[in-house]
């Protein structure tokens, strides 16, 4: 969210960079600041840090979108929400990271008014959509695990929920988009290394009264950070309590659920808890600075220190969250990890025709249900969540597994180089 402080980070506050102090001319009441906010080593450090998270964000989240969209077995409720998180992270990487980096390096706002509004709006909508999506994931897991007999959330309802999430994100960020504007700072100029002067512009929220900004910041903090994350904590605490209990009878009078299924569900919950926890910690410093600016009554030197050094780091940490989610998926989830590997292997190994097939078996009642196994080639990517592609997914208690993970059915393991021998993966394992 650009222009966080009541006086924007790059406005008429005294700045000192590159060994050149801000100078004020009493006779004309003019203030001159260095064009760049930091020395060359500090600026280089910021550029490398932002470039790293930008590349991680673009590559990782693009792969997540590719894996989920390419494989219809990944079209599940939880994976649709994960896809929505990846889309919001991509928006942050495309529209917010570059402009924020340049804004943190140069004194003043170097872009036009439209970019000022777009950057602030997209960043605010992305963080709002992310936290609302995390709440939706927690609710969906809560219903599946704590109340397994209730009607499951369908894929269609999940897509409607995602549309509502973005509508709410746009609604709550509209005041910021309206008030964000670029203004010229009177009697304040930037001076470059060749002693050329430039007018100073600032991108900031021009509220009619300062108190209105405080109210809006407090509303944002409570509605898109504090309250949603408190709800997530309660949901996952109930889920953890349920998973720690002994497995009960399966629906339809089936035997007790396979303990391995509970462990798999627990791994899914661990991954989702890590995503929510990392989101909380990543955005906490930026929210703390926003509240400090509005309620702290900082002096000019303190505000200079916060805006020139603290805000760039807080922005970087918040943006790093958008880059870390794919790493969390790959670490905790085997199917996403296989999907990442397959995406890179596909460029080296051509995919043969008919490399993807399904096995079906008839279950009691005369209905054909998708069996536990989905036979895929190594070039195929991940598979759906343990909740299954729909509420009618088979119960994990009846799934024959070998070593609790993958049954190879006597096929040799994949050797060096490219191999097209199929691996059988539990389709319900997220």
Swiss-Prot record:
The protein's name: Neuropeptide FF receptor 1
Topology versus the membrane, per the UniProt entry? Answer: Multi-pass membrane protein
SMART domains in the record: 7TM_GPCR_Srsx
Primary role: Receptor for NPAF (A-18-F-amide) and NPFF (F-8-F-amide) neuropeptides, also known as morphine-modulating peptides. Can also be activated by a variety of naturally occurring or synthetic FMRF-amide like ligands. This receptor mediates its action by association with G proteins that activate a phosphatidylinositol-calcium second messenger system.
Sequence ranges on the Cytoplasmic membrane side: 65-80, 139-158, 236-271, 329-430
One annotated GO molecular function: neuropeptide receptor activity
**According to its UniProt record, which protein family does this protein belong to?**
Belongs to the G-protein coupled receptor 1 family.
| Gene3D superfamilies, per database record | Rhodopsin 7-helix transmembrane proteins
**Residues linked to a glycan:** 10, 18, 29, 113, 195
Q: Where in the cell is it found?
A: Cell membrane
Main location class: membrane
| Compositionally biased region (Polar residues) | 9-20
Q: Which residues lie on this side of the membrane: Extracellular?
A: 1-43, 102-117, 180-214, 293-307
What cellular-component terms does GO give this entry? cilium; plasma membrane
Q: List the disulfide bonds.
A: 116-203
